[in-house]
């Protein structure tokens, strides 16, 4: 087993989380650049050249310049093998992002240093809290005018309830951005702008009290010395144990666009971030060093290859080793499958996986049998937990332009809901189809994909639905009574789970009071 252990110990699997426009896609590009995975990083907004960001590869993403789907990239760095999951940054694509966070062992949080903590970051951090995921923080855009760094860290501590330990500290900002002081190494790393795929060789001055610093920085030298005395008294020291518990975050400063500071983060992730962690199942904890293979599906993606109408299920490997041609047991349906063509990814560039280890993400071709949350083992009947469905926040009724295509519409919606792109509800008392999403852009995506993939033209209508809850009751008799009396508010979701569709929050609260034995759940395990 030693070969397996060596491979597992090398892995670092993390996702990047941020508010839209904090620079997440740029960071993703630069992380790949520093890992030599990309020779030329695509800048995100300069689309005229036809140079699209490597991790934004669905048509709609290319049109809009936002990353809609989760891409997976693997590359070596500093003796480790990094699996980076690029999560949708646009605020409307949060549910897919939430689920991706269940497949990683740590997260890199990117904050726009001019703006500080923003609302989408708050929501994403709430999800990482469900599993106490370790967080590394990058204060981006230091080559612009930024807020006071101590103020930024105070805000992270106050709002996100996580202690901050600065690892690097900015010297100046905007046009006067001179570089950073690396606190742990006692080094000044001078800023030299590198754009696109140019990485400037770092110019380093050893020691905060080195006279060389005065020659290079002039009055800034004493300024940073004074500031570091203040910082030492006002901030936390880095503590790896607190970091691994999700209680403390190491903080780095830099500019992703200027190719500066990204390698400092990667060094920290390699040194401190956890290697693949054990996973909870309904039976027991599964550890990465177990001999037998196991993994779970956290995302399903249609049409990764425009030439084929295929669907790929993304699997996080949890234990053992994937080998080409191996037999896996699909626990939910109780069937064995031979897998010879699993994929590894370089953001849309796919290649056949020869082998994969815990922490790795592989793609399985899915012909409609796999769902989000499905567990695969080498025979053991266990189910990994903690891959949630979140109650949608917005609803529309969907209607066909051509009524004869009802069958294709339903098929398309169910497949898109299994993929996690949207949720679909079929009211018990009517033939309506209701689509639920976490943001407006998801509705657009669904109509676009129904047209291009299923040849179905659909339109939306408003509907008075405020929220949805999955309903459960241990007492069959009481559940039957509830179904009978509330049928006008009940629907089945894409997986045939009973759901309460509330026209208003007042209506929901009244029903919850009236039926105390019925559980109204905001999330549902897949």
Curated annotation (Swiss-Prot):
It is found in: Cytoplasm. Belongs to the TRAFAC class translation factor GTPase superfamily. Classic translation factor GTPase family. PrfC subfamily. NCBIfam families: prfC (TIGR00503), PRK00741.1 (NF001964), small_GTP (TIGR00231). The keyword Transmembrane helix does not apply. CDD domains: RF3, RF3_II, RF3_III. This is Peptide chain release factor 3. Keywords: Cytoplasm, GTP-binding, Nucleotide-binding, Protein biosynthesis. GTP binds at residues 18-25, 86-90, 140-143. GO terms for cellular component: cytosol. Residues 9-277 form the tr-type G domain. Increases the formation of ribosomal termination complexes and stimulates activities of RF-1 and RF-2. It binds guanine nucleotides and has strong preference for UGA stop codons. It may interact directly with the ribosome. The stimulation of RF-1 and RF-2 is significantly reduced by GTP and GDP, but not by GMP. One of its GO terms (molecular function) is guanosine tetraphosphate binding. One of its GO terms (biological process) is regulation of translational termination. Its main location: cytoplasm.
């Amino acid at each position: 087993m030693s070969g397996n252990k060596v491979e597992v110990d090398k892995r670092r699997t993390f996702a990047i989380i941020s508010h839209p426009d904090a620079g997440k896609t740029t960071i993703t590009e630069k992380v790949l650049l520093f890992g030599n995975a990309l020779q030329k990083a695509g800048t995100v907004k300069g689309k005229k050249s036809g140079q699209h960001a490597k991790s934004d590869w669905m048509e709609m993403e290319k049109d809009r310049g936002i990353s809609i789907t989760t891409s997976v990239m693997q590359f070596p760095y500093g003796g480790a093998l990094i699996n980076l999951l690029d999560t949708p940054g646009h605020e409307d694509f949060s549910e897919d992002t939430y689920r991706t966070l269940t497949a990683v062992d740590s997260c890199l949080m990117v904050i726009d240093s001019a703006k500080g903590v923003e609302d989408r970051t708050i929501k994403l951090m709430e999800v990482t809290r469900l599993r106490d995921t370790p967080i590394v923080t990058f204060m981006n855009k230091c080559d612009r005018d930024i807020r006071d760094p101590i103020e930024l860290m105070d805000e992270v501590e106050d709002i996100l309830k996580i202690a901050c330990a600065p690892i690097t500290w900015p010297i100046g900002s905007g046009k006067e951005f001179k570089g950073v002081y690396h606190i742990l190494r006692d080094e000044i790393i001078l800023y030299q702008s590198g754009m696109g795929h140019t990485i400037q060789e770092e110019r380093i001055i050893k020691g905060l009290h080195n006279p060389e610093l005065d020659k290079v920085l002039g009055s800034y030298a004493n300024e940073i010395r004074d500031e570091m005395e203040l910082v030492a008294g006002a901030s936390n020291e880095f503590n790896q144990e607190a970091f691994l518990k999700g209680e403390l975050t190491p903080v780095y400063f830099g500019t992703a666009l200027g190719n500066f500071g990204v390698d400092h983060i990667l060094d920290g992730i390699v040194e401190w971030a956890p290697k693949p962690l054990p996973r909870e199942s309904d039976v027991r904890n599964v550890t990465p060093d177990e001999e037998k293979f196991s993994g779970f599906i956290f995302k399903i993606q249609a049409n990764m290859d425009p030439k084929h109408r295929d669907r790929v299920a993304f699997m996080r490997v949890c234990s053992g080793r994937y080998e080409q041609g191996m037999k896996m047991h699909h626990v939910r349906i109780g069937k064995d499958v031979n897998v010879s063509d699993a994929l590894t990814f370089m953001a849309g560039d796919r290649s056949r996986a020869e082998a994969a280890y815990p922490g790795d993400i592989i793609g399985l071709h899915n012909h409609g049998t796999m769902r989000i949350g499905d567990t695969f083992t080498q025979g053991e009947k266990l189910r990994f937990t903690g891959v949630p469905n979140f109650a949608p926040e917005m609803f529309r009724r969907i209607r066909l332009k051509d009524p004869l295509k009802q069958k294709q519409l339903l098929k398309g919606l169910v497949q898109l809901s299994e993929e996690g792109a949207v949720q679909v509800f079929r009211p018990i008392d009517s033939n309506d189809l209701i689509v639920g999403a976490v943001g407006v852009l998801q509705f657009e995506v669904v109509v676009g994909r129904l047209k291009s993939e299923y040849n179905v033209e659909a339109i939306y209508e408003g509907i008075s639905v405020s929220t949805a809850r999955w309903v459960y009751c241990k007492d069959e008799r009481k559940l039957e009574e509830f179904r009978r009396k509330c049928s006008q508010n009940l629907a089945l979701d894409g997986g045939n789970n009973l759901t309460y569709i509330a026209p208003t929050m007042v209506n929901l609260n009244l029903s919850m009071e009236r039926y105390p034995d019925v559980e109204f759940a905001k999330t549902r395990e897949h």
